[in-house]
Curated annotation (Swiss-Prot):
Species this protein is from: Branchiostoma floridae
Gene: LYRM9
CDD domains (alphabetical): Complex1_LYR_LYRM9
Coiled coil, from the record: none
Similarity-based family: Belongs to the complex I LYR family. LYRM9 subfamily.
Name of the protein: LYR motif-containing protein 9
Pfam entry (one): Complex1_LYR
């Protein structure tokens, strides 16, 4: 089964814009006191990589961000 947050399936996240939307929707599944922190973290991550142009590097960043989001959501659920 493919995890779906909002209207975006995790497997469909292949562009920075879709990643941003996916991560923000993941933040909405966090406890109230953690939402602001992680939304700020997502924004900062995008600001720090906005000048990245190498498609291979962008895919590496997307893969790592998805792994991190899974880890955080699993941590909150336990």
């Amino acid at each position: 089964m493919v995890p779906i947050v909002g209207l975006i399936a995790k497997s469909a996240v292949n562009t920075p814009r879709l990643l941003y939307r996916y991560l923000f929707r993941c933040c909405d599944r966090l406890p109230e006191d953690a939402k602001g922190h992680y939304k700020h973290h997502v924004r900062q991550g995008f600001n720090s990589h906005e000048d990245e142009t190498d498609p291979e590097r962008i895919q590496q960043i997307i893969k790592k961000a998805l792994e991190d989001a899974d880890w955080i959501l699993n941590k909150v659920r336990s």
